[in-house]
């Protein structure tokens, strides 16, 4: 004798309630919480032959109220030296995409045409994880409400710390890494502010209590816009020194008049603490006008080159003509997990972001550097010799006048300065090193505003020295890099074996982090479903006992429940072994093993002469002739 209709309805109602409850409880995890696997890049259009590098990319929401989302592109290190390191790279502008850095400077790939990628020898991902971030909101692939674009540097830094907190929640196995920030141009304002925000965050009680301190270990800034008070006045001596402007001419007198007006503004107390001074911007515009010959003018990013007037460098570097169409391809957008509904197409520099981000209430980042250095944070500043817009004379004047740790500039003792040491790389003069009290300065000979574009191998050597990478214990072919004729720590710019011991330590760290990653990615739903199943089993058992005398054998065979139901499928997901934490979501064969010889064979771009690129196809507001060229053109404020 079976259940009566009322009892059947009661049991079915109970089952429906439990099923609804389980679905409701799992919904937030399965829909809103993303895992590292959701960001995994399975393939990259145009990728070269050989195994695909391990990458993750996509958007992370930093402000639900304003729909603020920052885009990131992460490359895992190809080899591990003595310990794991992560380098965060930022381009400047403000409003210029860090994909410039990824595809034209320090990333592992460069475009050889609009459709084909090639490996870059000297890329920075050899011994360090690379994290490229389009920030602030509105830059590159990042998006959000235009009404809430950032205006000040502390606001930008706060948003970036929020981004990192959310990023480490998704990728917890990278949180213990030694953390470095690197970038160029207007990132000379970004990076010190972000560093200050991180150090302040690390002192908070909840961070200390939860062991979430980030191991910030150093900053690298190339051709940085850091100190307007020293860098605006450097335009005139630089163009005289390089022979760009001939003194005594009517045009030169006009430039000198604008420089004098700028100096007057700099001496006004209200302007000494500002990042942007319009009257001082006129100096650069006057120089560009001076070089206007026919339809050409000097390239403000590399004075060895010319460009169409009035772009004057905006069409450079030549790779730019391929980068934009590549990043606008639908298959690339899909591969990088970009929200197509929120994007109108990648643009190198967002004019709207630059227009909003004037930092009128922010003090220049140079005022933060002494405190950072005194707290023990190593900082490296490097300059390309042939850059005009953020030239090396301005950077050197800034260092000379900066006071920290009981000294001024590179003083070793009162009146005694650290020597300028001559650097050679593979037998060629490469530049100058100078250092004291946690600050290092490197001048690259014959280099532009984008030094890694010109010399990827030399900048990688600089990076490895700064990070303290030493390949002595893991073997490899060392680079011949000498400072004042002496070799320092053994570095290698190219292929070499991995460190087995370090790899094992990294694997153990990944395994430890695996549960945390799964928990945040929605696998906690397994616990909920399991609990519901146990409760349902108890309900069945009690029902059986209650109705044994009625010949009860099963409940609703039409539901098709058996011992290998959904819980069996969840268990199968966890049977993939102890590989990568995203193993359930992609083919591990793409990642395991050492790179093939084809993968390790890449071409060098050192020493090449680059032709001026074609006219930029950016679709935002272009520059108009006349004043404030840098602030109205496609590169935002021009300091990318």
From Swiss-Prot:
Pfam families: Peptidase_S10 (PF00450). It is a single-pass type I membrane protein. Residues 542-640 are cytoplasmic. One of its GO terms (molecular function) is serine-type carboxypeptidase activity. It is found in: Golgi apparatus, trans-Golgi network membrane. GO terms for cellular component: membrane; trans-Golgi network. Residues 489-501, 594-606 have a biased composition (Polar residues). Protease with a carboxypeptidase B-like function involved in the C-terminal processing of the lysine and arginine residues from protein precursors. Promotes cell fusion and is involved in the programmed cell death. This is Pheromone-processing carboxypeptidase KEX1. It comes from Paracoccidioides lutzii (strain ATCC MYA-826 / Pb01) (Paracoccidioides brasiliensis).
């Amino acid at each position: 004798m079976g259940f009566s209709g009322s009892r059947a309805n009661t049991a079915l109602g109970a089952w429906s309630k439990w099923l609804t409850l389980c679905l409701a409880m799992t919904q937030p995890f399965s829909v809103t919480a993303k895992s590292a696997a959701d960001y995994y890049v399975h393939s990259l259009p145009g990728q070269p032959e050989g195994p695909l590098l391990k990458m993750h990319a996509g958007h992370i929401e930093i402000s639900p109220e304003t729909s603020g989302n920052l885009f990131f592109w992460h490359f895992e290190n190809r080899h591990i030296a003595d310990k794991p390191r992560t380098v965060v790279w930022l381009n400047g502008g403000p409003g210029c995409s860090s994909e410039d850095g990824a595809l034209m400077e320090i990333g592992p790939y460069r475009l050889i045409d609009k459709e084909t990628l090639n490996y870059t020898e000297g890329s920075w991902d050899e011994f360090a994880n690379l994290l490229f971030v389009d920030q602030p909101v509105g830059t590159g692939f990042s998006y959000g409400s235009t009404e809430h674009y950032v205006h000040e540097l502390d606001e930008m830094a706060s948003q970036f710390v929020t981004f990192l907190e959310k990023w480490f929640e998704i990728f917890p196995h990278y949180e213990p890494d030694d953390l470095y920030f690197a970038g160029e141009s207007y990132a000379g304002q970004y990076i010190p502010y972000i560093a200050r925000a991180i150090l302040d965050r690390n002192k908070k009680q909840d961070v200390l209590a939860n062991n979430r301190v980030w191991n910030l270990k150093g900053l690298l800034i190339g051709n940085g816009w850091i100190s307007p008070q020293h860098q605006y006045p450097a335009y005139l001596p630089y163009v005289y020194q390089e022979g760009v402007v001939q003194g005594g001419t009517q045009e030169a007198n006009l430039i000198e008049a604008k420089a004098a007006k700028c100096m007057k503004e700099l001496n006004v107390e209200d302007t000494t603490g500002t990042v942007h001074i319009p009257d001082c911007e006129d100096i650069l515009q006057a120089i560009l006008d001076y070089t206007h010959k026919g339809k050409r003018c000097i390239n403000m990013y590399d004075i060895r080159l010319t460009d169409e007037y009035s772009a004057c460098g905006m069409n450079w570097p030549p790779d730019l003509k391929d980068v934009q169409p590549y990043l606008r391809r639908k298959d690339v957008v899909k591969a990088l997990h970009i929200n197509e509904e929120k994007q109108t197409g990648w643009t190198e520099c967002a004019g709207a972001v630059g227009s909003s981000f004037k930092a009128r209430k922010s003090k220049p980042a140079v005022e933060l550097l002494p405190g950072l250095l005194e707290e023990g944070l190593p900082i490296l500043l490097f300059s390309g010799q042939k850059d005009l817009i953020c030239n090396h004379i301005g950077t050197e004047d800034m260092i000379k006048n900066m006071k920290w740790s009981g000294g001024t500039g590179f003083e070793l003792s009162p009146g005694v300065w650290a020597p300028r040491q001559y650097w050679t790389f593979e037998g060629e003069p490469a530049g100058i090193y100078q250092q004291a009290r946690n600050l290092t300065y490197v001048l690259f000979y014959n280099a532009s505003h984008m030094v890694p574009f010109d010399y990827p191998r030399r900048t990688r050597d600089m990076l490895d020295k700064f990070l303290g990478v030493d390949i002595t214990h893991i073997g490899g072919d060392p680079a011949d890099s000498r400072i004042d004729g002496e070799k320092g720590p053994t570095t290698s710019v190219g292929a070499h074996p991995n460190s087995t011991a370090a790899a094992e330590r990294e694997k153990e760290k990944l395994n430890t982090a695996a549960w945390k990653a799964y928990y945040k990615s929605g696998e906690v739903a397994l616990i909920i479903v399991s609990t519901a199943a146990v409760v349902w089993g108890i309900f069945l058992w009690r029902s059986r006992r209650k109705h044994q005398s009625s010949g009860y054998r099963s409940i609703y065979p039409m539901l098709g429940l058996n011992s290998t139901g959904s819980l069996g499928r969840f268990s199968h997901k966890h049977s993939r072994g102890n590989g990568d934490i995203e193993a359930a979501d992609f083919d591990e064969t793409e990642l395991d093993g050492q790179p093939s010889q084809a993968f390790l064979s890449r071409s060098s771009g050192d020493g090449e002469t680059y032709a001026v690129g074609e006219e930029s196809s950016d679709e935002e507001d272009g520059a108009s002739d006349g004043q404030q060229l840098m602030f109205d053109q496609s590169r935002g404020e021009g300091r990318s």
